[in-house]
Each structure stands twice: as structure tokens, then as C-alpha cells.
Amino acid sequence: DSPGGASDAQKTFDVNSLMPVKYEEIRDPHLKELSLSFDPLSGHYDDDGVSAKRLMKELNEHRLLQQSHWFSLFNPRTREEDLMLYNVDEHSGNWDTFAGNAAFFRVHVNEGFFVYASYSVVIHSKLTQHVVLPPLYEVTPHLFTNSEVIQKAYAAKMTQTPTKIFAHFTGSKSNPEQRVAYFGEDIGMNTHHVTWHLEFPFWWDDAHYDHHIERKGESCSSWVHHQLTVRFDAERLSNYLDPVRELHWDDVIHEGFAPHTSYKYGGYFPDRPDNVNFEDVDGVARVRDMLLFEERIQDAIAHGYLRYNGSTINIRDNHGIDVLGDVFESSMYSPRQDYYGALHNQAHRVLGSQADPHGKFALPPGVLEHFETATRDPAFFRLHKYMDNIFRKHKDSLTPYTKNELKFEGVNIDSIYEKGNLETYFESFMYTGVNIMLLTNDVDDVDIATYITDLAHKELSFQEDVTNEGDIGVLETVRIFAWPHIDDDHVEFSFNEGRWDVIEMDKFWVMLEHGHHSIDRSSFDSTVTIPDRPSFHDIEDRTSEAIPHGKELHIEEFESVTGLPNRFLIPKGLVKGKDMDVMVAVTSGEGLAAVEGLHRSANFAHHGCPEVRYPDKRPHGYPLYRPVDDERIITGVTNFKHIQVKVFHH
């Protein structure tokens, strides 16, 4: 049974009803009545109402961020306010209290931090563990589309003309970076990035929230950004661009960026011209501080330990990357924020403020100061290439793998091959513009359909023929990786470079009995990717049908949204075919699967989540996580197999 005294369908309906028109009046009669009559101090809480009393005191004393104003999580004060609301929701003891608070604060607090707190608590609260929210690009479309779309939507509303709007990427053909705008500006990719930071928030404090988020530093700070970086480089190679160059604090920011995007309230996102020198940002950080924090982290990597309370923390092991990830961000898990700083978070603020570093023009935050918009700016990938290279120094300092550590005795991959051609193409993706316009009772609503161009691929599958020579069945973990075969100079990547640039394609578990087996794995089943979330209207229709009949929603596949959009599994191909290397590794799952029954169900969060342990005890990227002294160590084990494929684009 769903906890809290309400069905999952009712919970989903209530929360969704507060989302799509967050800037206007609540339309559901029951929730509207709650917004007027509910008293947060009368609710049932597991913290005796401490959080509610604190937030209500701030609200009544008019100390909270005003409505109709931009909100940025990176701003310490607005983040503090947002977490006050999160705490009230998190400590709600039943659904009546949760729904009452949601309706009440929906009309009393800043719209931006209401949305952030709501999405955060739905992900982390036990009361809402099966609630599915609409995609953020429907709820806060101004953060996901350009101003041209916004203007056309308003024109359609005012003229009462249902319309289709075709969105364009920013920039022009004279800007080479425009060739890969389909990656950084994709609304699914933007949603993927912000969702990771919702699932693994840097502000999470175990002492306040009653549980530890396992491997947060490794999963979010290191691995997901590493995968974004290597995938971006693969897309660049497909478009005849050099791999992205890392950022340097003592160098200029080479690429400018004009977002052509506006806040709902607060003006346009600031532009940044080409070749801007870094400046100190008042009230945020000095450039020399960023260099100092980097030097201290580099020093820790070189020594293999961090200093903490007069002792040391060893990082020359599998857990070290998790510690370093927390230090980089830095999260509340960082051993010494005062000494190692917050390189990642401060870098986002420093980069985002370069258009107005001293506040002379009172400009709002730049795109890099919002997780929703950050990947739109090419500087995002320069920043994360810079951080990725520091992580690489750590990983390359680890003891190389030996053959005995990699082999799986008695298991052989006899052959692997792709079934059919690997083909990519561009298609139009439609989403509703329901939340772009002000919805009022004075002017009728009109249908606004927004279309964007997405990269997609046809279904692909790999077949692995595997033999288990042992007498008993064994649990096996199958890992599929890929990387570009040649670099931008048409030189074949060395194995060590390819190892670092691998794109994770899939990871799954199978139980193999004695004998020969053929494993046919479709891209549709990949645990790395997820489908697009259902739209607000789709969720509304499903809940409206389920609630009166006491039915279940059955939308479990959308509960975890940490994966990549499923259309981005493989990088863009070429008309003549893009050469890619594919490696399949079959390794032992016995004693290394952290969750029971993985071979019987794919319904697990691939990268883990706060209430579920990460399913694989191995480090992200295993068995290519650490270096090897000789490529023949990899090619010489029978449980690894490598082939070359071509990816075509039509």
C-alpha cells in the first residue's frame, strides 16, 4: 500500500495539478481550497513541526525571496530558503499534510524554488516514491527554449490561434560550435543533467535527511560528467570538430555564448563574447582562489591522500574517486570544504557571472548558474574537460589491472556482432507549450505545440555468444562499451586513449548455466538510457481515469529519470559510416551485485538512488577504470571481446 493515506494515483494527480501553471491560479477546486484554508502549523510532522514553524516565521516576516523573481540554487540564501520548504515537505507525516503544504506554499513562495523543492522531495521522500512528475521542460519552458518560441506562443495566445512552433538552436552557421548544438541544447539532455543533480544534490546532509546517498561523489560529480564529456567529444568528431579543450583559469574563455533565452521574470540570460579574460566575481570567488583549490586537490592526488582533522584519508583505492567527487563539487560529504573549496560549484558561478562580475549592471545569473541551462553553453564542456582531466590523473595513479583481476575462469565470449546497421538520423520532437503563456479566465487557452530537432537512432542490438565451461550456473555481469576508432587527425586511438574515452552503452546481469548461450540485447533494453517522461496532459488523463476506479497507474518505468534520453545511446554517425570500437566484457556477478535478483528484472536505477543501493559493487567504468600495462592483458582474457562497427547517418 502507498504510505500516507492516499493512492499513488491521487498523489500523482495532486502534485501534477500544482505544476503546469505555476505562475497562475490553481485550477483544481480541492487544491485551490487547500491553498486558502490549510494552516501549515496544524499539520502532522515527524519533526514536531519544527521545519514548518521556521518557514512560516520567515514567510510572515517577509524574509523569503519574492515571487515573480528568478531563482538560482547556487545562491546561498535562496538555496537556504528552498531547503526550508523541502524540509517541511520531507517531514510531512501523511498525505493530507503534504498536499496541504504543497497547495499553500504554491501560492505564497517564489515560483522557482517551489518547483525545485517539489521535484526534489518527490524524488527523495518515502511518501512520494511512486509519484511521477511531468518533464521539467513543460513546467519551466523558459529554461529550455529560446525567446523566439516564447514570443510566438504569446502571439498565438493573444490572437487565439492554435499553432505549431518550430524551435531553432542558438547561434548561426558561422559559429562552428553550432554543429553540436543539437547535443548541448537538447531538452532531454538538459533534463538529464538537472535530474542527476536532483537525485544527488550537493546540499544533502545525512544528519538532516536520515540516510546516506551511496557513491554520490563517484556517480554524479565524476562518472555522469565524464560520460557527458566523452559523448560530447564523440559528437564533435562526427561533425569534424576537435575534441573540446579544457578550461584554464589563467587563459581566456575562447568561446562566447548568446543564449537567446529569457527568464519568466527577470530579463534575458546574459551574453558572453569570445575571448573574455576571467575576472574575480564579487561575493563569489577570486580567480586565484580557484587556482589555489585546484592546486590543493592536485597535491592530494599526487600524494594519494587527503588531510582531515590531523589524519589522512587514503584515496588510492576504489573508494577514492567517491571522496574526490565530493571534494570537487563540493558536497556536504566533503572532508574539508574550508581547505579544498567547492571547485565545481564555484566554477559554475564564476563562469556564469563573467558578463557582469562586479554587479555593475545588476544582470541575472548566466546559463551556467542553472543546472537546467548549463549544457547549452560550450564553456560547460570546457569546464568539465578540465575537471575530467584532474580525475584522470587520480585514476591513472591507481595500480594497473593484472590479468588475474580481469579474467573470468571458465567463461568465454566466442563471438559478438551487431544485428543490422547502426543508423542515426534527426527527427522532430513535439512537446506542449502549456506553461509558456499566462493562463487566465479572461482569454481562452489555445493549443501550442513546440517542435525541436532531436538526434535519434534506429533500434540496434548486439548478440554475444558465450560459453560457460563450469559445472554450475553463474551470475554474470555483461558490460558493453564503445569509443570512436580514430581522432580528429584520422589517427587510430591507442587502447589507453580509447579506454578513457569509452561510452557506456549497457550493463546488465544474466544467469548462465553450463553450456553455450546466445544473448541478444536490444538498445531498447539498455540500462543506461530512459524514455521521455509522459507529458502533463498524459499524466492528467491517466490519473483521472485511475482515481475513480481505484486503479493503479502502472507508470513505474518513469519513476527513475537518471538515464540519458534513449535516443542518445550512440553518437551521430556519418553518411559514409563512422568507425567505432565496441568491447563487451562478461565478468563475475557473484558477490558483486549489491541488489538481489538483478538477472530477473531490469527495474532498477542503473546509477542507484537514495533508497536503493547502487546495483554493482564495481567502480563505474570497470574494467576500464584503471590502466593496464599492456593492451594484451585485455585482449588475452577470454571473457572480453572487441569488434569494430560503423555508425551511419541518414
From Swiss-Prot:
Post-translational modification (record): Contains one N-glycosylated and three O-glycosylated residues. The position of one of the O-glycosylated residues has not been determined. O-linked glycan at Ser-120 may be composed of two GalNAc, three Gal, and two N-acetylneuraminic acid units for a total 1525-Da MW.
Gene3D superfamilies: Di-copper center containing domain from catechol oxidase, Hemocyanin, C-terminal domain, Hemocyanin, N-terminal domain
Binding site for Cu cation B: H344, H348, H384
Molecular-function GO term, any one: oxidoreductase activity
GO cellular component: extracellular region
Domain of life: Eukaryota
Glycan attachment residues as annotated in the record: S120, S172, N309
UniProt: Cu cation A binding residues: H193, H197, H225
UniProt tissue specificity: Hemolymph.
Signal peptide: none
Keywords: Copper, Glycoprotein, Metal-binding, Oxygen transport, Secreted, Transport
Keyword Electron transport: no
Main location: secreted
Locations listed in the record: Secreted, Extracellular space
Subunit structure of this chain's protein: Hexamer of a number of different chains.
Family: Belongs to the tyrosinase family. Hemocyanin subfamily.
Its job: Hemocyanins are copper-containing oxygen carriers occurring freely dissolved in the hemolymph of many mollusks and arthropods.
Protein name from the UniProt record: Hemocyanin subunit
